[in-house]
Amino acid sequence: MRPFLVFVLIVSVSLAFSFEDMPNKGGDSVASITADQARGHKRNPLFPFAQRSLTELKAGGCPLYCSSQIFCCHGRKCRNVDGRLKCVTEASMLGK
């Protein structure tokens, strides 16, 4: 039981420090916040779990950029637009 508690404590501290480095930009969209997180994921091996949880907490917005770890909202597809992977609707891809 004690090793499990130590593990939970380490994971909690590691997640806390990974979010502490992120600036709090109140006016930014969810997309830019998740893009900032994507740059820092190499430092934290638990990042995909943490990033997905944060994205789910911010359910009011939809990411603009996507990757193998950042998913688009329902009804949007991840497409290469001008060399960047973006979440787009079918209508916007057709120019409507």
From Swiss-Prot:
Signal peptide residue numbers: 1-16
Single Gene Ontology MF annotation: toxin activity
Protein modification: Contains 3 disulfide bonds.
Residue ranges the record assigns to the propeptide: 17-52
Cellular component aspect of the GO annotation: extracellular region
Subcellular localization, as worded in the UniProt entry: Secreted
Keyword Transferase included in the entry's annotation: no
Tissue note: Expressed by the venom duct.
Keywords for the protein's UniProt record, in alphabetical order: Disulfide bond, Neurotoxin, Secreted, Signal, Toxin
Chief location bin: secreted
Keyword Cell cycle: no
Domain notes per entry: The cysteine framework is VI/VII (C-C-CC-C-C).
Protein purpose: The recombinant protein causes paralysis to polychaete worms (Nereis virens), the natural prey of terebrid snails.
Protein name as annotated: Teretoxin Tgu6.1
